[in-house]
Amino acid sequence: MKKILLAGLSAIALLALTGCGSTAGVTSPDGKFIITENSGVVGYYTFSEEITDSLEVADHSGNDIPVYTAALDGSELDEGYEGDGLYFNGNDEYITLDPSVLDGDGFTFAAWLNPESWRVWSRVLDIGNQKEDLWIGMDWSTRMLRMDVLGAKGSVSVLAPLPKIGEWTHLAATIDGGVAKLYINGKLTQRIPCRVKPADIGANVQGIYVGASNWPDPLFHGVMDNILVANRALSGSEIAAVYKGVVAFDEAE
């Protein structure tokens, strides 16, 4: 794999890279987000390898936490944002994430989406058990992209423009126990105060799905690529860097 040299990093970035307990993001000279041991990224899935009969998708975050696809007739790769992406057929294809994504004080989900169609309530992400839950999908009333975070401490809805059919759009979502945010193409669309924490959602989690729902809702239909999950809320500048590109843990030196 191509190696990305980290020349030109600031002293602060180098301290974060070498492991001083910091979770500050590190960026490359061209502004891309670099996954390090301290970045908080627990999974990064590029779909650069063929999906075999095991339905395993390799992790490029350095944590070696694979995820698994679900299509009964075999998962398919399609043209992605970079190289290949995973094709979600809208019928039985989705990804199950590892529970470690809820281990931190915050949470980040980011991915490139190229929808083939949208159905009301179709899911990009759904984590929880319906009572304590975080989901992202198409809203019925506004026809916008909506993130709901709900639990015993209250519930909030955050909105963003719905990614257009047939076009690549970068989506990022964060929560940190104080605020929930949605980003489209590296820019914040809305932020809403939120008291629910990942630990609240993960206490009795039922499903941790990319492309499927904990309710009987439609599945995502289209292609996703470069799915990144972190157990902290990345900052706005870090999300902007992720939008520019990600240097995988196994690509940096």
Task: Annotate the PLM regions.
Residues M1-I4:
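Positively charged n-region of N-terminal signal peptides that target proteins for export
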Residues L6-I12:
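Sec-dependent N-terminal signal peptides
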Residues A16-G19:
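C-terminal motif of bacterial Sec signal peptides marking the signal peptidase cleavage site
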